[in-house]
């Protein structure tokens, strides 16, 4: 076998093996829909048949009956903020779940007073295993009517400046904001109860805020009434296939980016014309190579 043949075979093998590794190696990043480990959303997205968006500009033009769930760990563009506002004001339901305060840019853009504190919420008494897993037991009547008696948060924060927002859930009176990070209450640190979930009307739609996205992950969704609480937040008039998960504003590893690119390529070449074009390129390339390798003339 000639050296050119060896190089070509090696290159093809490397490409094929790389593609297989990207496809079959599991996702490990927090809140990724395809991540079936403890910190992923595979369970939630599979159970509720969620669709993923890679940009807020992909939001449907008719948002009634649709729910967008966003965890804002990356900033939004001006165009995306405009699309979010359009989605809500025209009848969509936006659920913003945040524990670090990045979601405040959405609140500011919408002209709302509410904010995510970004400071850790601890509860040494009403908690699951440790104070960083506060157990929420105080709910608005509508939430209690939906069968929600307790919800377990995981490294949460609180909501502030509620304004016209309707509070859906509060932490206990033993909870506090750990401003100095020592995990102990001091007189300078505010004590609860604090709002941790709220909703308000925005145009024809609804905007819901939850101060902890971790209730979605595989290891938390089954705790207490977390699943029932999420179902209440999503609403019961959601259309089939109407749950949308915004993955554009989640931090991604190089593996995640590669998986997304492969998925987009697979989507493109699943249509007849692009697939035929790709096959024509492959056959043409193989034919030229075979002709060249046999000493033929290629014009």
Residue ranges, per PLM feature:
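Short, surface-exposed patches at the edges or C-terminal ends of soluble domains, predominantly
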Residues: 1-299
């Amino acid at each position: 076998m000639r050296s050119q043949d060896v190089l070509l075979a090696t290159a093809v093998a490397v490409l094929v093996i790389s593609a297989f590794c990207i496809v079959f190696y599991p996702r490990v990043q927090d809140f990724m829909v395809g991540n079936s480990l403890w910190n992923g959303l595979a369970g939630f997205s599979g159970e509720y048949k969620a669709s993923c968006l890679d940009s807020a500009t992909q939001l449907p033009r008719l948002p009634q009956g649709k729910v967008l769930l966003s965890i804002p760990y990356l900033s939004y563009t001006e165009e995306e903020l405009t699309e979010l506002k359009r989605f809500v004001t025209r009848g969509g339901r936006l659920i913003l779940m945040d524990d670090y305060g990045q979601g405040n840019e959405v609140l500011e853009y919408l002209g709302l007073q509410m904010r995510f504190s970004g400071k850790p919420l601890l509860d040494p008494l009403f908690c699951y295993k440790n104070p960083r897993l506060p157990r929420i037991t105080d709910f608005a009547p509508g939430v209690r009517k939906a069968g929600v008696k307790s919800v377990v948060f995981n490294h949460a924060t609180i909501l502030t400046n509620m304004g016209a927002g309707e509070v859906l859930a509060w932490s206990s009176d033993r909870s506090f904001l750990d401003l100095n990070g020592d995990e102990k209450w001091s007189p300078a640190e505010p004590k609860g109860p604090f709002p941790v979930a709220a909703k308000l009307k925005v145009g024809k739609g609804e905007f819901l805020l939850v101060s902890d996205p971790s209730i979605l992950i595989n290891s938390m969704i089954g705790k207490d009434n977390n699943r029932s609480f999420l179902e209440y937040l999503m609403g019961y008039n959601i259309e089939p296939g109407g749950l949308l998960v915004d993955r554009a504003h989640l931090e991604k590893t190089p593996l995640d980016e590669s998986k997304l690119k492969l998925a987009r390529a697979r989507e493109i070449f699943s249509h007849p014309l692009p697939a035929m074009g790709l096959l024509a390129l492959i056959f043409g390339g193989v034919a030229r190579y075979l002709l060249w390798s046999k000493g033929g003339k290629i014009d």
